[in-house]
C-alpha cells in the first residue's frame, strides 16, 4: 500500500536490510555514557478505541516510521516482533531513539507489553514520561521536547505531511476492523509528519540525534552555557553567597502571590482584565544594565 508516496509495510514485509548498515553517531566528548545512537529517525504512535462499558481503551492499530519507511500492525505481538527484527544484530551499547508525541499516554500501554529498564524511566514531574528504555530502543517524548502539539509542530516547520484533520474518534474500531484508505492516511500521517518536523528542527538548529535536547528548556540551558563561557569560573564562584546567607535567602523568598485589593474585597466585578509579566525575575536580570553582581560583602 502507498500513501502520499510512502510505502506502507507490515512487520513481515518491512525492509529491515535497508537499515542494517545504518551508522552510529560518535560518542560525545566528556560523556561517560557508553551508549551510541544509531543514525535513524524513528517515530511511533497508536490509535485506540474507548470501551465505555469497562472504562478502558484498547489499541486497534500501531504505526512506526523509520526514516522514509512506515510499518503498520494491528497487534502488540506484531509490534514486539517488529522491534526484535529492527534491533537484530545491534551491539550491546547500540540504541535507536524512537519519538512518541505524548509518551506518557503510550507508555501506559507499552509498559504491559515490553520490559522497560526501571532506572531508565525519567519522569521530570508528576506522571509525565520524558524518556524510557526498553532493550535497544530509547523512547522519548517529542511533546516535551518541543512543548507544542503535533499540529503546531508540523505547521511550524511546514512539512509535506502536516497533521490530517477530520478523523472520527468516536467510531468503534478493533484490531480486526478493516481500515479505509482515508483512515490509513490519517493513521500514518502523524508518524510521517513527526519525523519530517523533527528532521527540519534538527536541520534548523544544527543538531543531530546525538545533540538534540531532551526538552524545550534544554535549548535555553545550552545557549546559556555557551554565553557563560566568556565569564571565568572563579568570578562566578565568587558571586555565590556563603551557606548561611543562602539559607536566609531561601527562608525569605516568596513569590507567585495573588492579593485582593482591599477596596474591592468581597465584591463581584465584571469586565475585568489582567496583565502579567512573564518570567519577570530573569527578565530584570537580563534587561537591567546595572543589575547588582559581585562578591557578597558583610557590612559592619
Question: Which residues are covered by each model-predicted region?
Answer:
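N-terminal accessory regions of nucleic-acid-interacting proteins
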Residues: 1-42, 46
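Conserved DEDDh/DEDDy metal-dependent 3′-5′ exonuclease domain
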Residues: 68-179, 185-193
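Anionic group-transfer/hydrolysis microenvironments
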Residues: 45-49, 102-104, 108, 143, ...
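Gly/Thr-rich phosphate-binding beta-strand-loop-beta motif of the actin/hexokinase/Hsp70
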Residues: 31-63, 272, 279
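Short secondary-structure boundary/capping segments
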Residues: 57-61, 112-119, 285-298
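Common nucleic-acid-contacting/processivity interface regions adjacent to the catalytic cores
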Residues: 5-17, 21, 52, 172-174, ...
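Cross-family signature of deubiquitinases and ubiquitin-like deconjugating cysteine proteases
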Residues: 4-7, 60-69, 98
Amino acid at each position: 500500500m502507498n500513501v502520499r508516496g510512502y510505502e506502507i509495510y507490515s512487520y513481515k514485509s518491512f525492509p529491515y536490510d535497508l537499515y542494517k548498515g545504518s551508522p552510529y553517531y560518535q560518542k560525545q566528548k566528556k560523556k561517560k555514557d557508553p551508549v551510541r545512537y544509531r543514525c535513524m529517525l524513528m517515530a511511533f504512535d497508536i490509535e485506540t478505541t474507548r470501551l465505555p462499558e469497562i472504562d478502558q481503551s484498547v489499541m486497534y492499530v500501531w504505526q512506526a516510521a523509520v526514516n522514509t519507511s512506515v510499518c503498520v500492525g494491528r497487534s502488540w505481538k506484531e509490534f514486539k516482533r517488529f522491534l526484535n527484527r529492527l534491533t537484530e544484530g545491534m551491539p550491546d551499547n547500540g540504541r535507536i531513539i524512537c519519538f512518541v508525541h505524548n509518551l506518557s499516554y503510550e507508555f501506559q500501554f507499552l509498559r504491559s507489553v515490553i520490559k522497560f529498564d526501571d532506572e531508565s524511566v525519567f519522569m521530570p514531574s508528576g506522571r509525565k514520561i520524558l524518556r524510557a528504555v526498553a532493550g535497544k530502543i530509547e523512547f522519548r517524548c517529542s511533546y516535551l521536547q518541543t512543548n507544542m502539539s503535533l499540529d503546531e509542530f508540523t505547521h511550524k516547520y511546514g512539512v509535506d505531511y502536516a497533521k490530517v484533520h477530520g478523523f472520527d474518534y468516536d467510531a468503534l474500531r478493533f484490531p480486526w476492523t478493516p481500515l479505509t484508505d482515508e483512515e490509513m492516511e490519517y493513521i500514518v500521517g502523524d508518524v510521517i509528519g513527526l519525523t519530517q518536523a523533527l528532521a527540519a528542527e534538527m536541520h534548523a538548529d544544527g543538531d543531530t540525534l546525538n545533540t538534540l535536547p531532551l526538552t524545550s528548556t534544554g535549548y535555553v540551558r545550552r545557549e546559556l552555557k555557551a554565553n557563560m563561557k566568556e565569564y571565568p569560573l572563579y568570578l562566578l564562584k565568587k558571586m555565590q553567597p556563603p551557606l548561611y546567607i543562602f539559607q536566609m535567602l531561601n527562608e525569605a523568598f516568596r513569590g507567585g502571590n495573588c492579593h485582593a485589593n482591599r477596596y474591592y474585597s468581597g465584591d463581584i466585578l465584571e469586565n475585568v482584565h489582567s496583565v502579567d509579566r512573564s518570567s519577570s525575575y530573569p527578565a530584570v536580570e537580563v534587561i537591567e544594565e546595572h543589575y547588582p553582581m559581585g562578591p557578597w560583602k558583610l557590612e559592619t
